[in-house]
């Protein structure tokens, strides 16, 4: 892999989002497929290939993009799938990668209200629609708890509106750590 030859040791890929909405501006041309099994198969091969070259993969954008038509760079965006549909799609892909030893994921600024409601039936609207990067329900209860992921969690770009529109940055950074993020992408505070 050329990246290894120039000293790159971490890749923000594979993009394991499932393209279920052709109007999605983020992943409509960046993901493997609309098909869950093909997405998993190609992602596993990508992961195997770059790990053989000494590069750690970070699958993204947990909990999954490709459902809504909004761009998290500019707006809030949820993943509207039911818990059962999420388990059969994004849950299947991430679970397969975790079983194969995926070392890291990139958390997206994407809400997953069905799972928040699963963990807290009395969740407030704010909790239901909190992006994964700021949601303990998604990163701690789902990712680390139910899915048993024990790798590194990096945020998607921390200046994207999907994250910054939720609270002041001075509150957002500790909230992301408390939710379960280990590292920030584009941490550019003075």
Q: What residue spans do the PLM features occupy?
A:
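Aspartate-rich (DDxxD/NDxxD/DxxxD) Mg2+/diphosphate-binding motifs
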Residues: 29
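N-terminal capping/interface segment
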Residues: 21, 33-34
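Active-site-adjacent structural elements in enzyme catalytic domains
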Residues: 1-7
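Second-shell residues forming the walls of enzyme active-site clefts
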Residues: 34-189
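Surface-exposed helix-capping loop/turn segments at secondary-structure junctions
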Residues: 8-11, 54-56
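Short, conserved phosphate-binding/catalytic loop or strand-edge motifs used
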Residues: 16-26
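Divalent metal-dependent hydrolysis catalytic cores, especially in the metallo-beta-lactamase
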Residues: 9-15, 180-184
């Amino acid at each position: 892999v050329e990246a290894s030859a120039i000293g790159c040791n971490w890749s923000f890929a594979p993009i394991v989002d499932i393209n279920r909405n052709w109007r999605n501006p983020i992943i409509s041309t960046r993901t493997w497929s609309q098909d869950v099994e093909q997405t998993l198969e190609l992602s596993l091969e990508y992961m195997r290939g770059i790990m053989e070259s000494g590069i750690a993969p970070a699958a993204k954008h947990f909990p999954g993009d490709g459902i809504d038509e909004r761009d998290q760079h500019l707006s809030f965006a949820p993943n509207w799938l039911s818990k059962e549909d999420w388990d059969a799609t994004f849950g299947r892909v991430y679970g397969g990668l975790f079983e194969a030893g995926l070392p890291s994921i990139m958390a997206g600024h994407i809400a997953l209200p069905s799972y928040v409601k699963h963990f807290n039936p009395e969740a407030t609207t704010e909790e239901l629609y909190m992006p994964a990067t700021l949601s303990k329900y998604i990163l701690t209860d789902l990712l680390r708890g139910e899915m048993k992921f024990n790798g590194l969690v990096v945020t998607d770009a921390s200046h994207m509106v999907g994250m910054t529109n939720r609270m002041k940055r001075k509150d957002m950074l500790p909230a992301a750590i408390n939710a379960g993020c280990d590292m920030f992408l584009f941490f550019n505070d003075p």
